[in-house]
A protein has these predicted regions:
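Alpha-helical transmembrane segments of multi-pass small-molecule/ion transporters
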Residues: 1-293
């Protein structure tokens, strides 16, 4: 089991490390690539996953509902911890709820379960993103407007993907169009990992105490919720494995972008995100062990 987990984690770590080394040496401006990834490439991955022949949306509802429960349950568990530690819940709670199911979760799903694990992992990623751009933004800034959420490419891709998936028996995309979408979307996984490595070279450890607390609470809360609900929800072995990987993931980089946009202590959130992603070396193997056993 140890060698299997190591073989899953190693490619993820090496690609992130390659991004970090390149970032330290070349100091690239990744803003254009990151924007293209979020606006075009990742949405194509969502659409291609939902319409793939091996993916049936109705068969994934239990997994997706469990994913929603982990997001909400982690927030409920994190709220009193934020109060007790003297942190503003608007700063601390969202990073505990919304994890790195894109940059790290998608590659782990592929390396752990093969290509058959990608489509349901993308569905989890899409649902988590939809919650982040609505509930997550409101938690950080209760006055924020979410009217523009339906103009977000990821949200549009999710809605389109759900529609195409549920109408697959009536209409399918022409094969050349599907292959074009899939080819572009397949670039998401390595780009996200490499970009995460580049971003980590600029990390701020000013709030390292809060960062270590968040690094532990995010995966622990997720795994606790997963352990509580998994015995009562019927799932396949693949779905159970994906659920525990999802539960063990660190805070998403997107939390920093949302905090920065809303001026909600972005430096503290940056520390939580950085140390959380470093701590993935500890908690993701635990999630893999629970999901693979």
């Amino acid at each position: 089991m140890f060698f299997r987990i190591a073989s899953i984690i190693t490619p993820v770590v090496l690609i992130i490390f390659a991004g970090w080394v390149y970032g330290r040496r070349a100091h690239p401006d990744m803003s254009g690539i990151n924007k293209a990834t979020l606006d075009v490439i990742a949405p194509m991955l969502v659409v291609s996953a939902f319409v793939s022949k091996d993916f049936e949306l109705l068969e994934q509802w239990n997994l997706l509902l469990c994913g929603v429960a982990i997001v909400l349950g982690s927030g409920i568990l994190a709220w009193p911890i934020a109060r007790l530690s003297g942190m503003d819940p608007k700063t601390f709670v969202p990073p505990m709820m919304f994890n790195n199911c894109g940059n790290m979760g998608l590659p782990l799903a592929v390396f752990a379960f093969g290509t058959v694990g990608l489509a349901p992992a993308v569905a989890l990623f899409a649902v988590s993103n939809l919650m982040h751009f609505t509930l997550g933004v409101k938690l950080v800034n209760p006055k924020a407007s979410v009217k523009g959420v339906f103009a977000n490419p990821m949200v549009i891709a999710t809605i389109l993907g759900v529609f195409l998936s549920t109408t697959k028996h009536l209409y399918t995309l022409p094969e050349p169009l599907y292959q074009s979408i899939k080819l572009l979307g397949d670039a998401t996984v390595p780009l996200m990992l490499f970009s995460l490595g580049v971003r980590m070279k600029d990390a701020n450890l000013k709030h390292w105490r809060e960062g270590f607390l968040g690094a532990a609470i995010c995966p622990i809360a997720g795994l606790v919720v997963a352990l509580l609900i998994s015995p009562f929800i019927p799932m396949t072995d693949l779905q159970r494995g994906l659920l525990f990987v999802f539960a063990s993931l660190p805070p998403a980089v997107l939390n920093f972008l949302v905090a920065d946009r809303n001026k909600q202590d972005p430096e503290l959130v940056a520390s939580i995100v950085l140390l959380g992603n470093l701590s993935a070396m500890i908690f993701v193997p635990i999630g893999l062990y629970l999901g693979l056993k």
